[in-house]
Structures are given as structure tokens and as C-alpha cells.
Swiss-Prot record:
Organism of derivation: Lachnoclostridium phytofermentans (strain ATCC 700394 / DSM 18823 / ISDg) (Clostridium phytofermentans)
Pathway assigned to this chain's UniProt record: Nitrogen metabolism; urea degradation; CO(2) and NH(3) from urea (urease route): step 1/1
HAMAP family hit by this protein: Urease_gamma
UniProt name for this protein: Urease subunit gamma
Reaction it catalyzes: urea + 2 H2O + H(+) = hydrogencarbonate + 2 NH4(+)
Family, similarity comment: Belongs to the urease gamma subunit family.
Subunit annotation: Heterotrimer of UreA (gamma), UreB (beta) and UreC (alpha) subunits. Three heterotrimers associate to form the active enzyme.
Pfam families linked to this entry: Urease_gamma
Record keywords, A-Z: Cytoplasm, Hydrolase
GO cellular component: cytoplasm
E.C. number: 3.5.1.5
Localization of this protein: Cytoplasm
GO molecular function per UniProt: nickel cation binding; urease activity
Signal peptide positions on this chain: none
Amino acid sequence: MMLSPREQEKLLIVVAANLARSRKERGLKLNYPEAISMIAFEILEGARDGKSVSELMQAGREVLTVDDVMDGIADMIHDVQVEATFPDGTKLVTVHQPIK
């Protein structure tokens, strides 16, 4: 199976997000890469489902709370930017202050 670099990156996000979700369900607090992957995954899947950029910007703020991540992680993540494929093309989705 031949995957482009972009497809490889998306696949890596899916794997990381699944691992993060599993750890969160076990009651573990997430680290930086786990938090980013969960937010990015929700944006990518939301775009695939046909949601708008504005809907995804809001949804990205609802994925995690400060209680879900290790101390200091929420302060480290100011913005999450994901290039997602929508029915009308590829767009950059930016979520400001995604963890509150």
C-alpha cells in the first residue's frame, strides 16, 4: 500500500488519537501529543462528515478540558491548526485556546 506523506500524517493522527482516547478512558491525564492528536482527529473527522469550518472551530474547543490533560498542557496549547479536506476543497481550520 502506497500512502502519500499527507495520508501517512492523517493515519498517524488517527492512531495517536485512538491511543489517547484509550488512556483518557482509563482515567489517565493526556500529554501534549495526545491532546493535539485528539483535537486534530475531531477536526479531520468533522470535515469528512460535512461540518463547516466554524462548526469545527467550536467543536475543537469541546474535545478536552483542563481536567483531561497533565498540569501545564492547556497553557502550552494556544492554537491547533489542521488542514482538513471538505467537500469543496482543503481548508485550514484553526482552533484558538482549545483546552479550557
